[in-house]
Swiss-Prot record:
HAMAP family: UPF0340 (MF_00800). Belongs to the UPF0340 family. It comes from Bacillus anthracis. Transmembrane segments: none annotated. SUPFAM superfamilies: TTHA0583/YokD-like (SSF110710). This is UPF0340 protein BA_5559/GBAA_5559/BAS5166. Pfam families: DUF436. NCBIfam families: TIGR01440 family protein (TIGR01440). It comes from the Bacteria.
């Protein structure tokens, strides 16, 4: 089995396991950070390839078609971990669009591939995503809503890259007397 085929297979299993647990809904935002260098077993930022980026992008687009989620592709630290998204998403949520074109050496291979293969791509600096996937320890946490909840899948690596995934939940607020699940005794005034 070639490395690319293995990467595709691992990604499919990981996304399927994730969706089974997280149950993402249509319209929710899914952020992806990825080091294609790490996927190939190299140090982050040193050996990114468009071939690996294409394989990962196509699997993520397939996941998007199946679930109706919106994708956000995190750039590397050279672009302050900005994100490539469809213009329609940026306009819908009034995300501020910034001017930069990701390239493999300043943006990363996956974000660059996304920028050249989305319908109408733009780059934004900030987002609060509902869930996400981190391939190669790229640190997507800054782009997740509070509170992040880790999701464990059967896949621990994509290629040679460590993979983590998370969904989010609303904050539990209110202190000692707060109630988080409605029960008969909590909805009556006796």
């Amino acid at each position: 089995m070639t490395e690319i085929v293995k990467v595709r297979e691992q990604l499919q299993i990981s996304l399927s396991d994730f969706q089974e647990q997280a149950s993402l809904q249509s319209g929710q935002i899914f952020v992806v950070g990825c080091s294609t260098s790490e996927v190939l077993g190299e140090r982050i930022g040193t050996s990114g390839t468009m071939e690996v980026a294409e394989a990962i992008f196509s699997e993520l687009k397939q996941f998007q078609e199946q679930t109706g989620i919106e994708l956000a592709f995190q750039c590397c630290e050279h672009l302050n971990r900005a994100l490539v998204v469809e213009r329609e998403l940026a306009m819908k949520y009034q995300f501020e669009i910034v001017t930069v074109t990701p390239v493999r050496s300043a943006g990363g291979a996956l974000a660059t591939y996304a920028y050249h293969n989305l319908k109408d791509p733009v780059v934004i600096e900030f987002i609060k995503a509902d869930a996400g996937m981190d391939i190669g320890d790229t640190f997507i946490g800054m782009h997740l809503k509070h509170v992040a909840v880790p999701v464990r899948t059967s896949v621990k690596e994509i290629g040679s890259a460590h993979v983590t995934m998370a969904t989010t939940r609303g904050k539990l607020i209110g202190g000692a007397r707060a109630v988080y699940a409605a029960k008969e005794e909590t909805i009556t005034c006796r």
